[in-house]
Amino acid sequence: MKKIFFAAALAGAAMLASCGGNKSGVQMGSLSDFDSLSYSLGANIGYGMSYEMKDIPFDFKLVDKGIKEGAMGKASQEHDKSLDMLREYFMSKRGERAQAIAEKRAAADSVRLAGGDSTKVEYPAADPEMFESEEERAEISYAFGNDIGYNVAQSGMPIQLVWISEAMQNVRDNNAKMTEDEVNQYLQYYFMVKRPAENAEASK
């Protein structure tokens, strides 16, 4: 099944929100009652990150903080500033640092082989050197979360933030309550069936 990555999902949600006039549906929520939409969205974000950003050692506590504060309109950083930071990092710094790390590892492997050591070294997927400092790691992690939170709020969906956080953590821990296919199926149902029906009813 074709994957629905979170950026596309949120873009679709924002378009539907503009049609239906629902601009505010975000709340912190409670883990006492499972929320399929919020969990699916969080798992979708988590799965997307595990594929496309596994090389980046985010501070996930700050990502989570950014999501919640951004979604509730309480971010300590303007969304435009977060976007500028993310563009610079992902369009320039990320690629340069990934290349430098790959070259460094290749050189280390060559030295070992030259010394007669053929043992294969398993390098971590996310290298700390993807960030130049802990300060930059914190800034990018928060900005990334703030961008997600901002777009969640703009989507107008009835989202419980605790379930987004829970799902993202579950995906990282490899114990998600929904498989990737189940997540995709639910989001397709929500965007193509449930949400349009709700918007049509609201516009009467």
PLM features: residue spans?
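FKBP-type peptidyl-prolyl cis-trans isomerase
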Residues: 41-47, 66, 141-151, 167
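Post-signal-peptide N-terminal segment of Sec-exported extracytoplasmic proteins
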Residues: 30-73
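Extended amphipathic alpha-helical interaction segments
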Residues: 113-137, 143, 150, 154, ...
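Bacterial signal peptide processing site
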Residues: 20-23
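C-terminal motif of bacterial Sec signal peptides marking the signal peptidase cleavage site
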Residues: 15-18
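Compact alpha-helical subdomains of small soluble proteins
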Residues: 61-113, 163-204
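Positively charged n-region of N-terminal signal peptides that target proteins for export
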Residues: 1-4
